[in-house]
Amino acid sequence: MGSSAEFRIQIRCSSNMRQRRTNTTLLSIPIELIVDILLRLPVESLIRCRCVCKSLRSLIFDRRFVMTHLNNIVTGINMNTNSFRLLVSHNDSLLLMYCEGSKDGDGSHLAIKEVDHPAVMDTDVCLCILGSCNGLVCLEIGDDNSIIILWNPCTRDTKVLPQPPYHFQDKMFHGFGYDSLTEDYKIMLATEGPSEVMMNVFSLKRNSWRTYEYLADLRTTDQQGCFLNGALHWITFEGVTSARNCLYVYNDPTEDTDFCIWIMKEYGVKESWTRVIKISSEILAQQVFVEVDKLELKVVCILENGEVLMDHEGKVLVSYNPKTRTFRNIIKGKEDDEFQATTYLETLVSPVTAAEGGGGANNM
């Protein structure tokens, strides 16, 4: 993207001493070099750059730039940014978690901060996370008269979607992803009909829902689908998640069965399944303080430092360090508390302009 033409940035400089302003051309740089520099920056820095001048704002808002920046993050080309984030809905709060370097230089630790709710919602309403893809998070807000929104937590862009043609209480499982064939973001909500499963599919391009009847008896162990490699994944036993562009599956532990996490190193190749984590039932019994047979562990994600984040019944969020073989509590709510979590990438993708097509990648 870009041309050989020069990109001139006019910046007005001020002097407090002389109370005067002058216009000065500070830069006269080929646009290819400017674009290359900007593509290496994290989203937070790019948002600040958009305020410098109209020229930079226009460039950073350009759909081709947004797509290239996204693809660089997903494919790992942009190694200078740590764009991986975990969004947690806990009671009335939204928490953002991410890995950052420790001050003593000894690896990294999990940082936690509270983030503002989307502007279209109150702070005391029920919130359900339906999934995330390419930096967009799909949220269901409210109880009886729920609405569904697409939200970029980093840029704060929000789009309220049309009401789906189903009753929220009938929802069986759901997913959110990007269809690269049609360059369209889609939401899939499966609901239980009188004698069949109803597949309700929302197209962001069309801004409308379509309903399909599916006669097979579909049952999954987890409501939220896992989006990877252009497809949504569910599993009919134990659990499934994704991290670092790979599928992970795990089993329910028992007193006689260890808790194991397996990774599919090469997508679609069953021989590539490799066990990466094994937690003995003895360690679980000693450190989690719940009878192993009553544990309902769900792998949320695997962090860059190798720690595994897991939740138990949406009540406790714990971190397991495979090096020290120890657990620590991240969130431990009261008996009536419940939380949800989803991973996402910090990107410039807007739910508003994404409806025009493009701006997608197949993996996250």
Predicted regions: what they are:
Residues 1-364:
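Short, conserved recognition motifs on repeat-domain binding surfaces
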